[in-house]
Amino acid sequence: MKTIRTQTPLRLGLAGGGTDINLYCDKYTGYVLNATISLYIHCTLIKREDGKIIFDSPDTNSYCEYESKEFLGNDGKLDIFKSIYNRIVKDFTKKPLSFSLHTYSDVPSGSGLGGSSTLVVGVIKAFAEWLNLPLGEYEIAKLAYEIEREDLGIVGGAQDQYAATFGGFNFMEFYNNKRVIVNPLRIKNWIASELEARTVLYFTNITREAKDIEEHKKGKLGDEKSLEAMHAIKQDAIKMKEALFRADFGTLAQILGKSWRSKKIISEIVSNDELERIYKLAIDNGAYSGKTSGAGAGGFMFFFVDPTKKYNLIKALRKEQGYVQDFSFTKEGVKSWRI
């Protein structure tokens, strides 16, 4: 083996986001509906013979070089890479490795498409391919969750890791003790195509740290109104799944708008004046409804719109500071290959 590559899809959170956080799902059970899209985290892993470890993330202007050893301490520089390496050595190889790891994303960090978790999945998959580790979808996702949420202590849920490994449209169930059931949905091709025709994905040019927003949400779950809103969001995931199977796009749009309102009840920091202005602009130009993807407060927003009015909405959004992002829904999760 000289080179391993992986391509890992990002995801759109359609409904139920936030109910996959352990503080909620351990007690109430969480339901999430999401779908992977044709935007990716790209990873290349190259075996070295000189006893060096190199981490290279050009899209974040980050580069680190170390002597190979069994444990790399966190120092604020690409700690997520080091934590993955530490777990691979601890759990599998029991000895240090020498390699170069290069990654980049199709979208900016803090975009709300599950980028950090998708990155972890892609890197784990690269190591699994290199070392012939017997890791299936559930094992990769669970390991990615443990690295990000437990080893690094980054607050957040589990949907992103499972979306990245399984790919496609999925209805996910989250229970206590990190138990997750992923239900792949057999959505007809024409329904997925129509959903694409009715969706506009817009990057607001506002990036944010999801962990800060999720931390704020955690503190609000003791509030009765916030908890009721979380319960409502969970039910929205069930209702949206059913509407998707029926190709009931009107109901899909209604649920999306309702979920956005509930999301703002849970935490007031998920929106701001600029996002509200963009939302109103979208509605004024033909959108039925919309919401942010992910934790909120910035990143990508997506809107449901009548396809005959889609161009007008795109034209209006292109006059703003962000950009409209083309995409399609994908059926595959993380994939790897050797060259």
Swiss-Prot record:
Residues reported in the UniProt entry to bind ATP: S57, G110, S111, G112, L113, G114, G115, S116
UniProt pathway annotation: Nucleotide-sugar biosynthesis; GDP-D-glycero-alpha-D-manno-heptose biosynthesis; GDP-D-glycero-alpha-D-manno-heptose from D-glycero-alpha-D-manno-heptose 7-phosphate: step 1/3; Capsule biogenesis; capsule polysaccharide biosynthesis
Swiss-Prot/TrEMBL GO biological process terms: capsule polysaccharide biosynthetic process; D-glycero-D-manno-heptose 7-phosphate metabolic process; galactose metabolic process; nucleotide-sugar biosynthetic process
E.C. no: 2.7.1.168
Catalytic activity: D-glycero-alpha-D-manno-heptose 7-phosphate + ATP = D-glycero-alpha-D-manno-heptose 1,7-bisphosphate + ADP + H(+)
Active site: D160
Transition state stabilizer, annotated site positions: R11
Keyword rRNA processing appears in the UniProt entry: no
GO molecular function: ATP binding; galactokinase activity; kinase activity; magnesium ion binding
Protein known as: D-glycero-alpha-D-manno-heptose 7-phosphate kinase
